[in-house]
């Protein structure tokens, strides 16, 4: 992967770790940082050797505090224009609806506005006990336009979501867990170990099965009738799984009492 200035990308076997690297400004994002993150997730999506991703923030204070409002204000004063997010959305992830590989958000501090929207776009959200979440855009004359309004209202009860969004209030990691948008809360020092543990458990499964599962779940959310959703399994990732080497290897390894050797094809 190309060298980056505002993010760090590490590869550990089948695992990609993406770190937002602007701790001096609470990992807020401007167009250049957004583009770097988008490039990283483009590579993740395209690389058949990468099966799971973790996204986190540098430092101990912030996962991502959203847009770099100082940059936005300066640009608008100079040009009259607002910065645009990349086509795949804030952080290169918020509008990436075609990504069938799993993403884990390891939230190490504040996740505000667009930062919270990145975390909501992940499949699993592991939070440090120091993490805090909010969609505070109405407090500065904006709205959570990178998927926060739509995702939060789908991931937790509507009245609780509205209570957060209409006030812009901050929510602790523990309350986020109780509401249901946080998968697990751990002591701050254990955050990355916990995220790696979850990634390791996913990597024990067939990547073909994981992609099929994610694709069916996410696309079925748009089907109002359960019976119709259950009948419709003609999704590309599900069909690919049924025709894969992995679907033969899994039962064979089970019968032979050994770990399966997944090929991802």
Can you say where each PLM-predicted feature lies in the sequence?
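Conserved CoA-thioester-binding segment of acyl-CoA-metabolizing enzymes
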Residues: 1-60
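C-terminal alpha-helix plus adjacent terminal tail
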Residues: 1-16, 48, 60, 71, ...
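Crotonase-fold acyl-CoA enzyme core
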Residues: 94-208, 243-244, 248-252, 258
